Amino acid sequence: MCGIIGYVGEKRCSIDVIIDGLKHLEYRGYDSAGIAYVKDNNVVIEREVGRISNLESVLKKDTSHIGIGHTRWATHGKPTKENAHPHKVGNITLVHNGIIDNFMELKSTLMSEGYTFKSDTDTEVAAAYIDSLYKENNDMIKSLSICVNKFLGSYAFGIINELETDVLYALRKDSPLIIGVGENENFIASDVPSILKYTNKYIDIENDEIVKITKDEVTVYDKNCNIINKEISVFEGDANLVEKNGYETYMLKEIHEEAEVIKKTSEASIDFDITKYDEIDIVACGSAYHAGLVGKYMIEKLCNIKVNVCIASEYQYDKHFYKGKTLVIAISQSGETADTKKCVNIANDMDVDTLGIVNVKGSSIARICKHVIYTLAGPEIAVATTKAYLAQITTLILLAVKNSKEKINTEDLQKLPYYIETLINKDYTSLANMLHTKDDIYFIGRGIDYALCMEGSLKLKEISYIHSEAYAAGELKHGTISLISEGTPVIVVATSDELYLKTISNAKEAKARGAYVILVTDKEVINEGVYDELISIPKVTEELRPILTIIPLQLISYEVAKLKGNDIDKPKNLAKSVTVE
């Protein structure tokens, strides 16, 4: 949520770098964008509501050696030009990702000092507070160190002081921020992919660290103003992974990368021992939560270990009765999900083992968990996850298999990439043509199929904006069936050997009430009257079926959203990385 980019250097125009960086941060979700740069020792600010293209249209043909930019996803204050970042108060101009919980208290104090405010944001209050401190001590590092103790909540700041127009300052707590290191130029950014066009060298900034950045030097301080040494890391991925490479959208490109993702994941060594634990809590949000449900079914079935799957935003408020030896598994694509991170901190504080399953190396969750397994999906830009979700469920399936007495069918495992490509190359447009005019679409399944239905339904509503719900098939007759009328689409997922006939019985119940039944299965269906459309999944061993079953559900969602003319990569109101609670 929100994206920050900053540049100081002599090789490029900061305006061009910042606009390019903001475009690479669009996937994080935003409703306004802005930029601040220095011209003739004065800070120039431009802000616009809507897409970055709106901001570009008002920019002058200026050149500058230093600047900061921001994409805002509204939290405090509506998405208006006045509330968009950057904000300038006195000599301080800043951009901010996060939430200052005590900003109203600070605002009241600042108003008593004579400060006035043009926006409703906590960010403008932060700018005023830093300006007030700087007036007192004439020292930016000291001023920011005071902020570390005074600001409650989460934040990542990029700051320009109009009295020091060759310096960027940065500060973070519980919100992602990295420093990009170049030659005669340096950067600040919310993530590494946004600056890969310019450098693959970066410094991870930890909580409460303050950074002073010039074109030649990066100096990092702790909250007591002591200089600390930081290691420079090198991003080893392919920079082309953050480009569309000829595909019409990032989401379609990422779906087409799934075969390679599965190949890499299946060849990776997953050696973590879960058999020493009596119980496992999986904490996650959104699609990662659905991946956790798949993991629960696999671990309980194959390893005979009790698994609880918990929505992270609720888990942190629960009372925890850790009995025996417990493991908390935190699943997050970005590794920055605020609610999930909070759960890890709770477990760590109670001396419970934690395992992160994340896609981004060096991310916050990867750093705070006692153990980590990296999914090998590579950068994922589309807001709606596809390949990262697939990597998560594959990792969990392989983790369960390797900790059980079961031996996976290696022939099926090796054929998975081929089967995935076969499913991707099927034509789902005629089905999408029927679905895209509907107001409601339902998914039903049992057991692990129900978990896949939940993900399929989420994917559909995320990008098509059609109301969709997933229900346990056995609950259909307990109320949900009243929603079904003539022509209501019901997508039935039925791959479980044990539960197949029961699920088919539920499909018949829906069809008898007029439902248009779309059956997704790997079985030979004898009674064709059960369904109106059939999507066949290649036959593989039961442990691997979820990997194949989700592919057509992703592509149906994609084709429906495309027919509706939606912005598939950047659905309205959504953010890729949810970094506030």
Predicted regions and their residues:
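Glycine-rich phosphate-binding loops that contact phosphosugars or nucleotide phosphates
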Residues: 275-415, 446, 493-537, 556, ...
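Generic C-terminus detector
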Residues: 516, 530-531, 536, 540-581
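Fold-independent oxyanion-binding glycine-rich loops
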Residues: 10, 49, 70-73, 90, ...
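Active-site phosphate/pyrophosphate-binding segments
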Residues: 257-281, 371-489, 499-500, 564-581
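Short helix-capping/linker segments at secondary-structure and domain boundaries
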Residues: 10-14, 132-139, 165-166, 401-410, ...
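Glycine-rich oxoanion-binding loops at beta->alpha junctions
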Residues: 65-82, 261-271, 295-331, 467-483
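Acidic/histidine-rich
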Residues: 154-185, 438-462, 497-499, 504
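Conserved short alpha-helical segments that host acidic/polar catalytic motifs at enzyme active sites
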Residues: 1-244, 248, 263-264, 268-276, ...
